[in-house]
């Protein structure tokens, strides 16, 4: 699947938004990828996650883990297509943790799956949890990489849609300087304001 084919799925499902957004990373942008809107359609979910699963099929993956909340749907479907255990990490009091009775054994080869990577912060936190369990991070995957490959998180890393989408530190944001209202649609928007 090409970048343009993936982008067409986002556009046709209304998942690529234009405006003034506060991203989960805290940075600001004029574009927002609302993956949930494209992933709500089973044919898109299956196709997108099938591409990710195919990329890692021969990598010995035994577990897929995703950061909550955005990565859960993608991670679950990738895990289903790979036929492996699928879990997620979530924040408790601001810290990413493996909870809900989930566990990782030191022998596991773990694929970290996220919906959108901007700075990679959530993925890094999940990777730290995997390493703390003594397991191996065998790869990182995402549906969208907003850095167009500039954010390098693992030796084996794959993103279906690679685009360089400009983002700004809040104090440097030209959209803020223009006085445009900001929207914070990300999964941490309520917790971070």
From Swiss-Prot:
Pathway info: Pyrimidine metabolism; UMP biosynthesis via de novo pathway; UMP from orotate: step 1/2
Listed cofactors: Mg(2+)
Disulfide bonds: none
Reactions accelerated catalytically: orotidine 5'-phosphate + diphosphate = orotate + 5-phospho-alpha-D-ribose 1-diphosphate
EC number: 2.4.2.10
Aminoacyl-tRNA synthetase listed as a keyword: no
Binding site for orotate: 118, 146
Binding locations of 5-phospho-alpha-D-ribose 1-diphosphate: 114-122
Subunit structure: Homodimer.
PANTHER family for the chain: OROTATE PHOSPHORIBOSYLTRANSFERASE, URIDINE 5'-MONOPHOSPHATE SYNTHASE
Protein's name in the database: Orotate phosphoribosyltransferase
Source organism per UniProt: Chlorobaculum parvum (strain DSM 263 / NCIMB 8327)
Lineage of the organism: Bacteria, Pseudomonadati, Chlorobiota, Chlorobiia, Chlorobiales
């Amino acid at each position: 699947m090409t970048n343009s084919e993936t982008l067409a799925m986002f556009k046709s499902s209304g998942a690529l938004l234009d405006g003034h957004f506060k991203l989960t990373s805290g940075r600001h942008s004029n574009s927002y990828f609302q993956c949930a809107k494209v992933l709500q359609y089973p044919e898109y979910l299956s196709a997108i996650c099938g591409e990710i699963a195919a990329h890692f099929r021969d990598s010995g993956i035994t577990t897929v883990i995703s950061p909550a909340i955005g990565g859960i749907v993608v991670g679950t479907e990738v895990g289903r297509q790979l036929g492996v255990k699928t879990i997620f990490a979530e924040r408790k009091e601001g810290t990413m943790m493996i909870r809900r009775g989930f566990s990782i054994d030191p022998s596991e080869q773990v694929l970290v799956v996220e919906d959108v990577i901007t700075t990679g912060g959530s993925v890094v936190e999940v990777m730290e949890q995997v390493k703390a369990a003594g397991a191996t991070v065998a790869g990182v995957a995402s549906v969208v990489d907003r850095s167009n490959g500039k954010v390098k998180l693992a030796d084996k890393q794959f993103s279906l849609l690679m685009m360089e989408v400009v983002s700004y530190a809040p104090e440097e944001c030209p959209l803020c300087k223009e006085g445009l209202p900001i929207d914070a649609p990300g999964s941490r928007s309520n917790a971070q304001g």
